[in-house]
């Protein structure tokens, strides 16, 4: 559902800044899948190594006789002839237990990142002009925000989805294990290879956090359960999001372009050169909105291109672009960044007319 058609719809509804977070969510989900696949590949390679070691060790059986005269075959397993496990990353030997532990932590961290990215989509695509600062947004922030009557009334389906996620045991486990391993300490996970008839052991260890006991669980079961939960949640989210953003609840006074940039050069007087970005008014300056939200977007057959609006001041002109009526001033500062947002401009009522260009 996250395709070029949806991208164009976001442009039409003036919430295009949400698209960057849609692609980032999919990137996070892809990373989660990669972690799971690589963990399984590590276990598979270690298992294969163990099987081959056992085949080799069986060739070393020696004949022996027990005390009661029974003929037997014996084999000796020591640290010197035990299997050696290692994997290569970028040509370097890496301890598989280290890689297993890192990838397992990454698996849950990127799962949480995916849900936080979904919250950024909500912030940019639904809250829009009422959105929170991007650096303060995460899934818990959106859960709290959408439990407020204003937003639960405006977007009831999204509120239901958020509460469903918050109340899910699967999400609560993901959040708990991520916070434990990210901020507190390791968990006693187990990865051991069975030899001579015994089975492999692959477990996520038990842990106790915020008065809740989380029991040990078979690794493969939890990996698959988390993947299923994440993918199902994402599909449900996209359905709900598409039903909600078309309401255009908080997208007033958004623009994807300005009228142009006027440049005026005076021959022999370079210090008097004049250049300014402007918007042509269809009405009086007084009748224009108090705020504008601008993201420069160009839609063509080759795709959609967007850029932050770099102008700190935008003048308002009449039908003649040299007839200056007033100005808007940027309400926030932008830096050198790839993040896109609808930059807020506030009407400056302190000056009007040509003095605005000074």
For each predicted feature, which ranges?
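Acidic, Ser/Thr/Gly/Pro-rich intrinsically disordered interaction regions
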Residues: 1-109, 119-358
């Amino acid at each position: 559902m996250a395709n070029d058609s949806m991208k164009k719809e976001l442009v039409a509804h003036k919430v295009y800044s949400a698209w960057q977070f849609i692609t980032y969510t999919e990137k996070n989900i892809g990373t989660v899948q990669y972690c799971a696949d690589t963990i399984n590949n590590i276990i598979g390679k270690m298992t294969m190594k163990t099987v081959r070691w056992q085949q080799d060790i069986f060739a070393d059986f020696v004949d022996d006789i027990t005390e009661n005269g029974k003929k037997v075959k014996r084999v000796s397993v020591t640290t010197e002839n035990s299997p050696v496990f290692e994997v290569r990353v970028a040509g370097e030997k890496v301890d598989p237990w280290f890689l297993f532990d890192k990838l397992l932590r990454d698996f849950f961290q990127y799962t949480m990142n995916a849900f936080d990215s979904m919250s950024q989509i909500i912030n940019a695509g639904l809250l829009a002009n009422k959105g929170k600062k991007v650096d303060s947004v995460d899934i818990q922030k959106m859960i709290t925000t959408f439990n407020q009557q204003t937003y639960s009334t405006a977007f009831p389906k999204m509120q239901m989805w958020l509460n469903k996620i918050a109340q899910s045991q699967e999400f609560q486990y993901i959040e708990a294990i991520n916070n434990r391993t990210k901020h507190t300490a390791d968990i006693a996970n187990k990865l051991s290879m069975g030899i001579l008839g015994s089975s492999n052991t692959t477990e996520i260890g038990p842990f106790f956090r915020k008065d809740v006991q989380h029991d040990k669980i078979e690794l493969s079961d939890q990996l698959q359960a988390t993947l299923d939960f994440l993918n199902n949640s994402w599909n449900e989210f996209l359905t709900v999001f598409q039903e909600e953003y078309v309401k255009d609840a908080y997208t007033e006074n958004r623009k994807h372009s300005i009228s142009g940039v006027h440049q005026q050069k005076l021959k022999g007087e370079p210090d008097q050169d004049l250049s300014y970005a402007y918007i042509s008014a269809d009405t009086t300056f007084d009748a224009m909105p108090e705020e504008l939200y601008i993201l420069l977007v160009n839609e063509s057959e080759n795709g959609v291109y967007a850029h932050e609006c770099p102008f700190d001041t935008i003048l308002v002109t009449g039908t003649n672009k040299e007839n200056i009526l007033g100005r808007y001033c940027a309400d926030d500062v932008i830096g050198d960044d790839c993040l896109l947002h609808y930059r807020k401009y506030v009407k400056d009522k302190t000056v009007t007319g040509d003095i605005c260009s000074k």
